[in-house]
Amino acid sequence: MAKSVVIAEKPSVARDIARVLKCDKKGNGYLEGSKYIVTWALGHLVTLADPESYDVKYKKWNLEDLPMLPERLKLTVIKQTGKQFNAVKSQLLRKDVNEIIVATDAGREGELVARWIIDKVRINKPIKRLWISSVTDKAIKDGFANLKPGKAYDNLYASAVARSEADWYIGLNATRALTTRFNAQLNCGRVQTPTVAMIANREDEIKNFKAQTYYGIEAQTTNQLKLTWQDANGNSRSFNKEKIDGIVKGLDKHNATVLEIDKKQKKSFSPGLYDLTELQRDANKKFGYSAKETLNIMQKLYEQHKVLTYPRTDSRYISSDIVGTLPERLKACGVGEYRPLAHKVLQKPIKANKSFVDDSKVSDHHAIIPTEGYVNFSAFTDKERKIYDLVVKRFLAVLFPAFEYEQLTLRTKIGNETFIARGKTILHAGWKEVYENRFEDDDVTDEVKEQLLPRIEKGDTLTVKLIMQTSGQTKAPARFNEATLLSAMENPTKYMDTQNKQLADTLKSTGGLGTVATRADIIDKLFNSFLIEKRGKDIHITSKGRQLLDLVPEELKSPTLTGEWEQKLEAIAKGKLKKEVFISEMKNYTKEIVSEIKSSDKKYKHDNISTKSCPDCGKPMLEVNGKKGKMLVCQDRECGHRKNVSRTTNARCPQCKKKLELRGEGAGQIFACKCGYREKLSTFQERRKKESGNKADKRDVQKYMKQQKKEEEPLNNPFAEALKKLKFD
């Protein structure tokens, strides 16, 4: 009997699919049943070949050998996962297999994972596509009942290949050109470089910002009401101190007369459902989680616990076909503290409205929402619980009615000047009930603070007991943190020097710099290549990042290039542009970039050279700030030796409770804190033992230290090798 091979992206998803399809016979890298064979990738099993596979001379990085422009780019099996590739290959080549079902992630990159495997195996069998947004049993069954023809996704595959090949031509050539021309470990890409440029621009704005003092007037009445002065244009601030001084002087011994009380009934609706970027932003703001950490937690909640839908989505809407499943999802997530809220929503039929249901705004995947799967809170880690809580509360909030309130604006006259006060009466808590009325609005910028207003009628006279001048200073723009950098990457149009509205709109519609799936990796890569560094929560550009921006061609610094690329990649995905035309343009652009770098007369200055020499090659080591602490890195890119000087650990200072830094090597290692606390590693081991009631032994501490090491950047990987593996998305 003929069988179908199903290719999943990961073993965990493969196991779920195999269970539903009753494939319980275990093989080497696959699971088999009577009709289906389920096998899996491990992310990418196949990638574009390294430059030296085209010509042995490319093994060495020489400026004169650039640009590298092979006619056709070849595919190669990734060595580390070669065993699994062979397992997939053997199943695809089986004579009893007459059909391939692509069940990798539903999106551009997922398409590439499976199709590159199929292309490398050189197999020509009919292809079908499983396109689902969650891996619950129901979603898998429904998906297999509605398989799509593989041909429907040929253009999406072409778009993915075009993106990958363009990154190879431009990314590898630009990186080699910069590194060899300036004798420094420099890498750039169409997303990385404009992201660094945005951080640099923000720092320039802060540096050039000149604070101005502004003035206002506040009056206090005997019935504890605070009145705020406003000019004829409704402004509460003035930069003219003399003017404010004069007004305050002229108001002496005047009372306030109530001119009008304006009552307006207002509504505010819940913020939209989460896409990945919005969730990463909120998790960073509320819990300090990095973008990468949030994605990893989401992946567990999606794959392992099966309680949330596909995480790598850029949509904040659901499609109309999902509306019918909402009651089941509410029943599944409506347990524990969410039970009363879910019960309230289920009392009435759910009304789909455009604020969260819009087919036109859902492409590959809908917004992140709960699945119909059983929720076992006891299986969650603390971090998983927090992320799950964010998603469920947002899901419930969207299904709750609007927050309704009556806004009262009190307009009074003191002398010839207008003073106002503002208050609010809640009519219906609506969706704010989900957040126990503690939801904070980021967009509230009103100068006039709301207060509890006493009973007042129009025409009343209020006794003024105090009139005082207020003052403040304008603030410089805030430095980026991971939350705000994600926002800037998602919508970089304000940083673009272009009058092309269509291009700006495309960047906005295609999700800005990078994709929801790649932004976390890009930010991580910028930290690990020492172009940016973290001080507290703030992100700062390093000297290396500054110099890189000075050395790269101008176009690579602007989001415009990404806008143009995304416009064309979208056209390829829609069948409106040939992949070959796009790649030809990219090759020509590569020639221009390399030529510009070659002819540059600029210099790169290592201003972080330490007194230490590299133990491998003897050259001076550079001192850099990694994401987890200080490191020494060999300045020779071909050597690439790295050594930790200190790293931030999860151990807490017993005095101030901040994270401790671990410095030194071996038995001489010492924990240090910014508050001045110091503790030897041996003393730390003893303290941990006592705190845990003498249960901790040497093995426990070694396990703890091993966990810390796992969180470090990889050490002593030759930089050239690392660059080869970089994806310049």
Curated annotation (Swiss-Prot):
The active site is at Y310 (o-(5'-phospho-dna)-tyrosine intermediate). GO terms for cellular component: cytoplasmic replication fork. Its cofactor is Mg(2+). Mg(2+) binds at E9, D105. GO terms for biological process: DNA recombination; DNA repair; DNA topological change. The record marks W61, W168, R176, R312 as: Interaction with DNA. Residues 187-192 are annotated as: Interaction with DNA. Keywords: DNA-binding, Isomerase, Magnesium, Metal-binding, Topoisomerase. This is DNA topoisomerase 3.
